[in-house]
Amino acid sequence: NPTSQILLRRILRGDNGITTRSLALDSVQEAFNLTPDILQLRFQTHAPALASQAARNALIKADLVSQDLDAVIISTCTGYLCPGLTSYLSESLGLDPSMILLDLVGHGCGAAIPNLRNAHALIHSGQASKVLSICVEVCSAAFYLDDDPGVLISACLFGDAAAAAVCSSRPSAAHRPIQTIAMQSTMRPEHRDL
């Protein structure tokens, strides 16, 4: 549809406030291969790699190694693996097989909140003292395109990336601590389609 193509060009080339966006693709043309098998393979290939890199970066910044962790929590909404992403991360980081591993799937844009709430709960219950919290999205594995302007704008906004943080009951003296005082989230089912 020519109107859709014009909208896509305006969003991607215009002054939209987005300075960079990363996609875990070798070429932009790959983004238009939207068969279910390709999308699943894209997620299975890139989500573990992005999560592992974010985890390694967080561990380096915290002056820790993976054996120092008691738990790992991963959130995503752009794909599904069974067993989950934590099984891939466990393998790539050489995690203790008895470690607490939690996969949170389907929380959408606010996934960091339940992820951090679970980390907070594990720490304050005494079940863990160091929890690696990871959010990873491979939006190129969840692409859906049609002529709806909302769908087109969404496809142009989101990229493929991961972020991670180490949550601890004992903050490091070398790093500025962030203290969790309280967390709250609200679910509004009537706004699910926004």
Where in the sequence are the language-model features?
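Buried hydrophobic positions in well-ordered alpha/beta secondary-structure cores of metabolic enzymes
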Residues: 12, 69-72, 115, 135, ...
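Short coil/turn connectors at secondary-structure junctions
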Residues: 66-70, 97-100, 125-131, 152-153, ...
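Active-site glycine-rich loop that binds ribose-phosphate moieties when present
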Residues: 104, 114-116, 135-160
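Phosphate/oxyanion-binding active-site loops and adjacent basic polyanion-contact surfaces
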Residues: 43-52, 112
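Phosphate/pyrophosphate-binding loops at sites that engage ATP/ADP/AMP, CoA/4′-phosphopantetheine
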Residues: 54-69
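Condensing-enzyme catalytic core mediating Claisen C-C bond formation in acyl metabolism
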Residues: 1-44, 145-194
